[in-house]
Design a protein with these regions (language model features):
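Bacterial Sec-dependent N-terminal signal peptides
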Residues: 15-33
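Hydrophobic faces of well-ordered beta-strands that scaffold small-molecule active sites
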Residues: 37-42, 77-79, 113-117, 166-170, ...
Length: 349
């Protein structure tokens, strides 16, 4: 009888522990999902507001864009910063002071912040990586110092407002490098020296900020292996691999379903090959096809969540609020009626 009682107690204890373990696992999975960065690059927002653009919530009521985004699951923002920008509404602004004000506003809404250094006076992307005008004529040592000083200055301005960005991206879509010609991938040694100067400047002010290096065409594993193999070979310092995913910009404009598995495979390969966290730091779909964009975003979120060892950190929609009527941009998540489209629901469903 004593043996039977002991066996029964042992079985009960085992079942109890298993139940607790399963509950903890479920809670852990929920916590991990809650921690996923669901973000938007909303750098156009101040200029949109200054021009008189009115944002409406799902009920058709005027409302602060931050509130609308937060109600749709957005918990993080990405802010680009330019060295000496013009006042052009779409291709200017994003100065240091404007970036700091936007970061303060995001923090007041309880959001995390990513700072995106373009190291240019305007757009930097795969098609152009123009050196800031004030940096022209500098020799390479002077150029490295200018990059360090500028990066430090922006980070210090944020720090003085009590802001330590969760993430800082050095360069924007840099498959060919940045700050051409010195930082072109034709000269990896110089490019990495520039990147590492940025890394050092960020960490000297905000050691907790994670550094992102960003390449476009997140579905193109060959492109990423080539780029990060070279970055590693030359000693680049970074924490996170960032990628863009825009099926609309790919050759032939394929539907997302044709390339989504390639994105997922690349995310996992980057995490495993380099032992780094990964993020989709830019994504977008056609505003004229909000349901399809919704499905695409849900698929991207699932691919990020599926990266082994919880190394998939998040996804950022590029200018979700950047309505075409104001920006002439075809890949926002905002409709002609001034309201978010169905696409934005992907972050709460």
């Amino acid at each position: 009888m004593k043996k039977l009682i002991l066996k029964s107690l042992l079985l009960f204890t085992t079942l109890l522990l298993t139940s607790v373990a399963c509950k903890n696992l479920e809670e852990g999975e929920k916590f991990a999902n809650d921690n996923l960065a669901k973000g938007g690059d909303i750098s156009w927002l101040p200029q949109m507001e200054a021009s008189g653009y009115i944002f409406y919530n799902d009920k058709g009521e005027p409302e602060d864009c931050f509130k609308i985004l937060k109600d749709h699951g957005i918990n993080s923002v990405r802010l680009r910063t330019w060295v000496n920008p013009s006042t052009h509404p779409q291709s200017g602004h994003c100065s240091r002071d404007e970036t700091v004000e936007m970061a303060k506003r995001a923090k007041s809404w309880g959001m995390k912040v990513m700072i995106n250094f373009h190291y240019s006076d305007s757009w930097a992307d795969p098609g152009k990586q123009n050196k800031p005008k004030d940096w022209e004529g500098l020799n390479f040592e002077e150029l490295k110092q200018a990059l360090y000083d500028y990066t430090y200055d922006v980070m210090d301005a944020l720090n003085k407002e009590g802001i330590s960005p969760e993430w800082v991206q050095l360069g924007n879509e840099i498959p060919s490098g940045m700050i051409h010609p010195e930082g072109h991938t034709d000269n990896w040694a110089q490019l990495v020296q520039l990147l590492n100067k940025g890394y050092d400047a960020v960490k000297s002010v905000s050691p907790s900020s994670k550094i992102i290096l960003h390449v476009d065409q997140g579905n193109n594993n060959e492109r990423f292996r080539w780029w990060f193999d070279n970055a590693e070979k030359h000693g680049a310092k970074y924490d996170i691999i960032g990628m863009s995913f825009y099926p609309w910009w790919l050759e032939g404009k394929p539907d997302y379903k044709e390339v989504i598995d390639d994105l997922g495979n690349n995310l996992s390969d980057m995490a495993n090959r380099y032992n780094k966290d990964v993020m989709v730091v830019e994504v977008g779909g056609e505003d004229s096809k909000p349901q399809n964009t919704y499905y695409m975003l849900r698929a991207v979120i699932e691919k990020v969540k599926a990266v082994p060892n919880s190394k998939g950190l998040g996804i950022f929609y590029w200018e979700p609020q950047g309505a075409r009527s104001w920006s002439n941009y075809a890949l926002s998540a905002w409709g002609r009626d001034g309201r978010p489209t169905k696409a934005l629901d992907a972050f709460i469903d």
